[in-house]
Amino acid sequence: MATINQLVRKPRKRKAKTSDVRALEACPQRRGVCTRVYTTTPKKPNSALRKVCRVRLTNGFEVSSYIGGEGHNLQEHSVVLIRGGRVKDLPGVRYHTVRGALDTSGVNDRKRGRSKYGTKRPK
């Protein structure tokens, strides 16, 4: 325990909080190229085949990114936009691909919550 005199001379330092999405480097989104597109299984107690892609970002980071929505058109060398946002039941997946941006198509036949899936308004 520090004495009051020691604290007067040198106050306590605040611990700096590190970001959960460090690869974005304080940007809202980042562009990258898919290096691998695959499915993976979630943690217990959930069961599914979650669509994930490994992305090499323009700043040199390589991260795993979740592909939301039903069906996608991504393959290796697709250019994608990623945003922050982890997937709780997939360890190590801390980013989401933005649907409807760059090479990623929007979700077909989506009627509600379209803005989150890059779908145009149906006629």
From Swiss-Prot:
SUPFAM superfamilies: Nucleic acid-binding proteins. PROSITE patterns: RIBOSOMAL_S12 (PS00055). The keyword rRNA-binding applies. The keyword Cytoplasm does not apply. The modification 3-methylthioaspartic acid is found at D89. Belongs to the universal ribosomal protein uS12 family. This is Small ribosomal subunit protein uS12. It comes from Teredinibacter turnerae (strain ATCC 39867 / T7901). The gene is rpsL.
